[in-house]
Amino acid sequence: MAAFSYGLYHSSRKTLSGVKTSVTNDWLDNATHKALFNSEYEARTFLGTLDAAFMIAYATGLFFWGWLGDRLNPKYVIATGMVGSGVMLTLFGAFPKWFDFYNAAYYVLTYLLFGLMQACGWPSEIAIMANWFGKANRGFVMGVWASCQPLGNVFGSFFTSWILPFGYENAFFMNGLLMLIGAFVVMISIDPKPKETQYSQLHNEESGERSHAVEGEPIKILDAILLPGVLAYCLCNACLKLVNYAFFFWLPLYLTEAYHWEETTADQLSIWYDIGGIIGSVVGGYISDKLGCRAPLIVAMLICSIGSLFVYAHIGAHMIWNAFFMTVVGVTVSGPYNLIVGTISIDLGSQPILAANAQAMSTVSGLLDGTGSAGSAIGQILVPIMQNSLGWESVFYLFMLLNTLAICCIMKRCVMDLKPWLSSISSSPELSPLLNDSPHEE
């Protein structure tokens, strides 16, 4: 059910991405109201501003909700975010159309609040998954589970394209309604931790022997940043999430403008990027379990992403080839992103230095995804500016540069992971999933 709930989170985010052409046309040319913008350039720039506003609020919210998720029942945090997201999505996209109320400040405010509510989900979802699953096959388990993000995108793309002929405002309303239904399902079906863990904690509390070694104290954000490996992956994710979310926000519009395809066709074709993300997440998690380390695999995938981005930028309007290389880009961009925010979040939040402190997980995952969202916020402003000034090709070169920087951020971690892995080929000792107890690690 955790995968179901976060899939709905992602599905609701996909709404604006799938209707940008319709929304732009409504802002520019409508008999019922004065045009909100004077040119398509202004409208597109404002769309980038909205995406950036969402990511800024989302990044800020991740730090807060991650901190709060270690102090409250994570199920309640998830449900609160779903209710708030459903309400804000309807107010943002449906309310202006229904009541002919078009105001730029109103759009920014409601989308900021939507981003803040969306941030409730991920840290608490990760905390729940960490309670239910241990180290065994963590890469594969979390790879499968983290695929709920691209699966949610796929569902959101299809659902939005299906509703779009009835009016883009109804796409916002129906996705908002799904979030409200999902919140109810979460409240009645999710257990934050296994029953035996709850019984054990209750027994310890009744006998006055509460185990601080298991629960621990909630960790401070600054202390979380200084944990081994956290800062490197935060910086890596700031670059990688910018690229991943640029595809998330702009891919349907790119397909519509670059190849003059219908908006519904572009929405449906864009799912191949998310299908690639599912493949990369699941297969990457499985391979990383077999390798006994994560960073070398992520570096290899990111190196491949640079070539796949270059090819995709020049692939042309042939739908089959476009879909194929879009899938390859999804494998090499969305795949490692899912591994970082999923599997590696748990690895970093449960490393030996924390002494099994279960109260650190949500904070660490919120920090990791929050810094990624901060980087992504910058990207959503850069994309329309670069596209308007230099064309779409320049945007893809920006993506290649950012993925190169992402590689640099974790190269030290990669080298450290490779040393014991290479030595293990001959000796075959038992390996930890990600983190080694090396004293020189930073």
Explain the meaning of each model-derived region.
Residues 20-59:
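Extracellular/periplasmic helix-loop-helix junction of adjacent transmembrane segments
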Residues 110-149:
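Cytoplasmic helix-loop-helix junction between adjacent transmembrane helices
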